[in-house]
Amino acid sequence: YIKSELESIENDMSEPRQAPFGRADKAACWLLRARLYLNAEVYTGQPRWNDAITYAGKVLDPSNGYGLCGNYEQLFMADNDENPDAKKEIILSIRQDGVQAKSYGGSYFLIAATQKSDMPNRGTNDPWECIRTRKALVDKFFANSEDIPFTEYTDNKWQNVRDVQAAAKDERALFYTTGRKAELESVGKFTDGLSFMKWSNLRSDGQPAHDAKIPDTDIPFFRLAEAYLIRAEAYLRAGGANAQQNAWLDIKALRDR
């Protein structure tokens, strides 16, 4: 029934990037169908790899106006609903606002729960000291724990995060390591496990957010990057001529952002 409902509403939806930000357009419909087809074999026993390729391709059509954000970190900052580079990658967002849409869930949870008072400022004055990373995630960026920099800075604590990104050669390695251990040995000790800095209530333009506690940061529910990943997997699973090359080109587009 999900497929039939998506088919029935498509023509009533706005063209790509023509809906108000935060409302679903046709690209959101196509991306959800691509997700559905990627997992069709699980649901129905019948693979639909080519349909997944087709609908991911519809989302990725350059004429739609969507594109990859050149700065990964800005996708998860307070002005991701205003910053043109971030907005162009976000197909559908869960809207957040520190004044108009206060909630103890959403991006507030993602920022406050990963924050401690000794960490770099991330735009909230309410650190909860709950969530940090397991080493399995860190291992995706550092095959050898000895390569992780544990630098300390008194004034510019964000420089530690930049050191980690530089050592990992990956801007997604948004970890804070000062005073931390890579191994999560004690669940009740916040400094066991690296702190995760992906989400913040800071703005890319340096201006203040609406509220010092509750974030403005929208949650990118559907992003263009997902369409690349769906199509790459579908290419490989479908097989055939140039399958590996086509999949690699989609992954390379993400790696080269």
Where are these regions (language model features)?
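Active-site-proximal region of nucleotide-activated glycan assembly enzymes
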Residues: 232
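Short, cationic low-complexity segments
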Residues: 110-138
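Structured, solvent-exposed acidic/aromatic patches
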Residues: 1-117, 188-189, 194, 206-224, ...
